[in-house]
Amino acid sequence: MRKIILCSPRGFCAGVIRAIQTVEVALEKWGRPIYVKHEIVHNRHVVDKLREKGAIFIEDLQEVPRNSRVIFSAHGVPPSLREEATERGLIAIDATCGLVTKVHSAVKMYAKKGYHIILIGKRKHVEIIGIRGEAPDQITVVENIAEVEALPFSAQDPLFYVTQTTLSMDDAADIVAALKARYPQIFTLPSSSICYATQNRQGALRNILPQVDFVYVIGDRQSSNSNRLREVAERRGVTARLVNHPDEVTEEILQYSGNIGITAGASTPEDVVQACLMKLQELIPDLSIEMDLFVEEDTVFQLPKEL
């Protein structure tokens, strides 16, 4: 009998929960409007619900009236933006994920020590923009092995590397291997800068791939970690679709006869997962459902001190 295999863990991580709660509690405490720099997390469903409650999402701090409260998103911001907020008299509340903050701190520390930092990630992603702002003259962003091969440094230069927290572990490992081959002296943090939730969701998906021939990744197309989940499946030869609404679960699935895997990005609400699951069961009524637990998660991040 065909079955749906639900990955666990999936969906919201501790950093996303903290960021969403930061906006919700701020609205409860101070009322609307509360301004938020960038989407608080990369998921349209989450952003739309918070907008209905009174959050105003902006990209330019000039859009925020003086002396208003502004929340920085989970992805982090460059120091220059914090300075701009202070200069404009804004009351800033920081919802940056603690694991992103850890990368910022490491970059700042090693830049002060004279190291050049190789930052592995998508250079246009808001997280990378924020990290790069810590030491723009001492950071080089690389997205792939070809860019590693084009780096101008010598085997004597002091080099340190970190990664975007939401990268594919597969891709990051390949890039790191290329870096170490060229620069044996390069080093990083004692623990990976790819966050625990990214590692767990990718690990949970890899765990079920031998049992399925099709995967739905429930997540927003703007979500880095959701896109990386899709790539994890495709890299291992399993067809994967990134969907963010049950309407995107289509009769295409009827072309496949094997088991179906379902996972969700770290910014995806569980009610969206369940809605997509119901649509799938409508299309294929005799599917059974099995949960595949990869690891338990119990990480909790405290809300910002202002709340």
Curated annotation (Swiss-Prot):
The active site is at residue 127. It comes from the Bacteria. Its EC number is 1.17.7.4. (2E)-4-hydroxy-3-methylbut-2-enyl diphosphate binds at residues 42, 75, 125, 165, 223-225, 267. NCBIfam families: ispH_lytB, PRK01045.1-4. HAMAP family: IspH. This is 4-hydroxy-3-methylbut-2-enyl diphosphate reductase. The lineage of its organism: Bacteria, Pseudomonadati, Chlamydiota, Chlamydiia, Chlamydiales.
